[in-house]
Amino acid sequence: MYAPRTTPWPLVALFTAGYLAPYLLPTTVGRLERGLDLSATQAGAVGSLLLLSSATAGFLLASRVERTGARTLARLGLVLAAVGYGGAALTTTVPAVVAGAVIGGFGSGTATTVAATRIAAEKDPHRASALGLLSVSALAGAVYLTVPHLPGHGLTLAAIALTALAVWPLTSRLPGGTSGPLAAEAAGADGTGASRLPHRRSGMVLAGAMLLWSLAQNALWGVSGRIGVDQAHLSEPTVGVVFAVALGAGLLGVLGAGALGSRLGRALPIGGGTVVIAGCIALSASATGLGSFAAGEIAWNTVYPVVLSYLIGLAASLDARGRWAVLVGSASSLGTAAGPLTGSVLSAQAGFPVMGAVLAVGLLLVAVPMTGVALHTGGRPLLPGAVRRRGGHPAALVAATTGTPSGAVPEVGAPEQPVVEIPLDGTPEPARTAYDTAAATRAPGGR
């Protein structure tokens, strides 16, 4: 009998704690702007510093999880997140808020890195990452429905800190280290040993493209709240409801990506999906009422996790140990970090519609190298109906990463290997009585 499939709930919870800060970025930036009397650019800069700190943790710790131990790093990250975000929520002094956001961001990045690395080593990474995405989207949606009805600049920061504290007890079920058989298995799975990264050129191109791709996404996400309030003339509670519905649509996107699997390969979802996202960004940035604003945000948040999941799947297919998944995810986090400030500056200088047009054109240009990598890089193959996935940092989105745990499977479309008949010499014994049993027999001459 097969062993029952277990759910790695500690990794799901850690994934949720790490990804919650980027999901709450629009309301965090908006609350800082109104609650601390900051300009839009200043509030966007605080959000960028938070995400930059998170990305830095990913770059620094991507190769250290195995040596240091998942439990130790996860607890460190959760402590930093609780202390940093909690301190920023309890003070109104701007330098202290900035310092707390930076410390908390590093904690979020640490938790995300541990979760991504461990999920990549799971027998069924798709299931764990999909549950993590569903969890963080549901939690963020609940916050978006609650926060607009309460005053204060630090509510979203406090929500992230409390989530980190709630996840802490589950870290006792994480391993103290990933050395030994797991490390040897991961090293052997990609055939590269313990140090050399495979597919370096494709990985670097994908990392650079992901940085710009994420920058464009989060340039809009960081100012979406202001677009809804200032340009579409909606109330903050209404904008919160739109965001909650959009995140709910994102849940459908995650489930759709899992159901779609490998049927369309990777190139079409990545290239075609990015084109659709570009149109959604242009629509949302030029919205002047509830209909256009909601349509742009909901459509965008539906397609975004689908494309992101295939991008992370492409990164994970380049290295079975999950190193490219973490490094590409960290590059994505750098773009995410620069997004709020970029969106604030562009919108302040040229207005929201022009900002949306610039971001849309940039996405169309970035789609070309990403699609090229998907077309020309083999990595681990996509197999029809495959449910085993390889995931990594960001985001988001490890959920529809597709691959197999071994490189010994032929690519889809590869010619079948011929079956060769091997002739055997001799003829079988005609009678079964020619054979004796394996039981003990009398010795020669015995009675």
Give names to the regions the model predicted.
Residues 72-86, 268-283, 357-360:
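Structural signature of the two symmetry-related core transmembrane helices
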Residues 56-72, 120, 252-266, 347:
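Helix-to-loop junctions at the C-terminal end of transmembrane segments
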Residues 122-126, 130-179:
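Helix-loop-helix hairpin linking two adjacent transmembrane segments in secondary transporters
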Residues 15, 19, 318-360:
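A late C-terminal transmembrane helix in Major Facilitator Superfamily
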Residues 94, 100-135:
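Cytoplasmic helix-loop-helix junction between adjacent transmembrane helices
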Residues 261-311:
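C-terminal transmembrane helical hairpin of 12-TM major facilitator-type secondary transporters
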Residues 109-123, 303-320:
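Intracellular juxtamembrane helix-capping segments at the cytosolic ends
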Residues 56-94:
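Conserved MFS/SLC helix-loop-helix module at the cytosolic interface between two early adjacent transmembrane helices
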